[in-house]
Amino acid sequence: MRTSGRLLLLCLAVGLLLESQAHPNADAGDATRDVGSDRTSVELSKMLKGWQAEKGQRKASAPKKFYVYPPVRRSFY
């Protein structure tokens, strides 16, 4: 029981260490950086909607595929 407790504590410590390395804290440069205006977001949204509409039109105008299967021969002995 004592060994399993130590192993659990070790795994917890390693997990916390890895978690802290995965998400570094933001520094002052990241906090003050301009990430974009609302206008940019609106323009991006419009562009995405346009691309989705074009994709939908391409799918609608695409010819439907059909398959021709050869006749099945059944041989009876």
Curated annotation (Swiss-Prot):
Job description of the protein: Probable toxin.
Species assigned in the record: Conus victoriae
Transmembrane segments: none
GO cellular component: extracellular region
Prodomain residues: 23-58, 73-77
Disulfide partners: none
GO molecular function term, any single one: toxin activity
UniProt keyword list: Cleavage on pair of basic residues, Secreted, Signal, Toxin
Domain of life: Eukaryota
Subcellular location: Secreted
Position of the signal peptide: 1-22
Keyword Signal carried by entry: yes
Keyword Signal: yes
Family statement drawn from the similarity comment of this UniProt entry: Belongs to the conotoxin H superfamily.
Tissue distribution of the protein: Expressed by the venom duct.
Taxonomic lineage of the native organism: Eukaryota, Metazoa, Spiralia, Lophotrochozoa, Mollusca
Name by which UniProt lists this protein: Conotoxin Vc1
